[in-house]
Amino acid sequence: IPGFYNVQTNVSGIVYDSLSFEGYSTLNTIGEPALPVITQLIGLPSYGSECNITIEDSIWTGIEINKVYPYQTPLLETEEQVEFDISTSVYNSASFNSDLVCIGTTMLYKGVKNANLQICPFRYSPIANKLSVMKEFIINISFDGTDEEDAGVLLSGFENLIGTISNYNTALMDTYNTALVRSLRRTDYQCYDYLIIG
């Protein structure tokens, strides 16, 4: 993590820090700390049914900050904020720990299964106003097992996935070759691994 942006906001005499990564969003539970997240669209192998995630070689650093600005109810352009959303139970707690890494719902794009990988490299203490940042890390994601259904057929133009799916490569696409998938299912080759280095 090379760094993040911080914009200070004063609400009723309390200074909050609005943190963000360029080009990415934040945690979005209303009233809870809007910590920045990194989101990557990853391709899933046709035969992968179980996802295993491990974080390796993580290096943490601690910083003192103001309270992290809470996520607010989204408003339409014509609406004005009437009430400031804040979870007092969360902000009066010693620690707020979201999942470091999570994978969203599986989707299908041009015949390729994919999902959003979300990384929130923070540990936050609202009471102490301290933030720990995982500034260096390696995320190892492996897929084991097989799906019961046959692999889908790739739609024409799947090369457009290059640049859309962060782990696009020939090995991933080969898992969607129906004949190859059937061959793989007759062997012990049932793992597909890759690393994300932050």
Question: Where do the model's predicted regions map?
Answer:
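Extracellular pro-sequences of secreted precursors
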Residues: 1-198
